[in-house]
């Protein structure tokens, strides 16, 4: 943390402030020191737990969804499933359990060395890639569960009817916010039209455009689909920057390099980028409805019938409820998919 703090302070000293996106970039991905490079963010010892580690049903029904996609495209040709991020590897492992054959290969797009180690332990045969350009040219299913929320954002606020950008500065050896003239006016104007006129605060995820573009080019060349599952909103605006440390919310500026910085996804930004690139877009739909549409409740009953243990039955119910109940992850998390312009219609988005 002290090394990251020193790097941030030095960069701020050059002109008095840095963008929130730069603060996030250094805090999360600075070589050897950034949170996503050096920390182990998952599980009880980390800062958050994702749906695949809460219930096996999550991965199993998504696995069945993926197999349906493969069958619709061409079940006999070689295919790959790539987990964007991937956590510990639980999701891909659950998907493989649904169907495993020589035609299907598995891989992770991951930069965190601790998670790469964990993924190799649970799934040694899976490949690892650091960039989409490294992934082999094959029909592909990309799955990004809580992947987009970690990319840097820019924030803007309207003060006295004038738009300002929010930056990070130093104040008595602490990081604090300040408001300055907008740094990239072209970027601001490009995205401002996507927000209501009455908005007085909005955010731009600056990496979504590149991610959607890179995945779209890959899928147009090779065929397949990309599934995104993340917390966010279809319409709306406001400050969603947050930090998690030891499973608790903390001030986003207080623990650079040792807390997980994320923001909510504006799914309208994905829709606009997808349409611009001439791709099909499905969703967004709540995680609750998506999983139920895929048969999560039916899978729960099958698993309950396979055991006589009341504790296991209760644990299965509690795990699924956590990811589908509206008061927990079911409503906040949304699901969408993008694919090339073809006749492929993925299940779950009815």
Regions found by a protein language model. Give the residues of each.
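Generic detector of well-ordered alpha-helical packing
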Residues: 84, 111, 147-150, 231
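A mobile, often basic/glycine-rich helix-loop segment
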Residues: 141-192, 241-252
């Amino acid at each position: 943390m002290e090394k990251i703090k020193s790097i941030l302070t030095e960069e701020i000293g050059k002109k008095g402030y840095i963008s929130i996106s730069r603060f996030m970039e250094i805090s999360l991905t600075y070589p050897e020191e950034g949170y996503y490079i050096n920390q182990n963010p998952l599980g009880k010892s980390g800062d958050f737990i994702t749906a695949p580690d809460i219930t096996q049903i999550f991965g199993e029904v998504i696995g069945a969804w993926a197999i349906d996609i493969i069958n619709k495209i061409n079940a006999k040709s070689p295919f790959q499933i790539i987990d964007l991020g991937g956590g510990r590897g639980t999701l891909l492992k659950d998907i493989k359990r649904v169907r495993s054959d020589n035609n299907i290969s598995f891989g992770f797009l991951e930069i965190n060395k601790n998670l790469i180690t964990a993924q190799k332990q649970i799934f040694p045969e899976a490949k690892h890639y650091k960039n989409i350009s490294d992934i082999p040219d094959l029909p592909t299913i990309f799955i990004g569960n809580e992947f987009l929320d970690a990319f840097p954002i820019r924030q803007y606020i309207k003060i006295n009817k004038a738009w300002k950008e929010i930056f990070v500065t130093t104040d008595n050896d602490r990081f604090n916010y300040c408001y300055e003239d907008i740094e990239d006016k072209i970027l601001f104007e490009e995205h401002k039209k996507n927000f209501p006129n009455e908005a007085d605060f909005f955010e731009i995820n600056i990496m979504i455009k590149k991610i959607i573009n890179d995945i779209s080019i890959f899928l147009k060349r090779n065929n397949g689909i990309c599934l995104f599952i993340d917390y966010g909103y279809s319409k709306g605006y406001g400050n969603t920057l947050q930090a998690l440390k030891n499973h608790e919310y903390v001030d986003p500026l207080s623990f650079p390099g040792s807390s997980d910085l994320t923001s909510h996804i504006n799914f309208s930004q994905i829709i606009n980028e997808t349409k611009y690139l001439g791709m099909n877009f499905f969703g967004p739909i709540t995680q609750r409805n998506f999983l139920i549409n895929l048969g999560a409740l039916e899978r729960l009953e099958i698993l309950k019938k396979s055991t006589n243990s009341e504790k296991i039955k209760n644990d299965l119910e509690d795990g699924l409820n956590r990811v589908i109940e509206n008061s927990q992850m079911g409503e906040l998390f949304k699901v969408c998919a993008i694919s090339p312009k073809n006749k492929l219609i993925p299940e779950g988005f009815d």
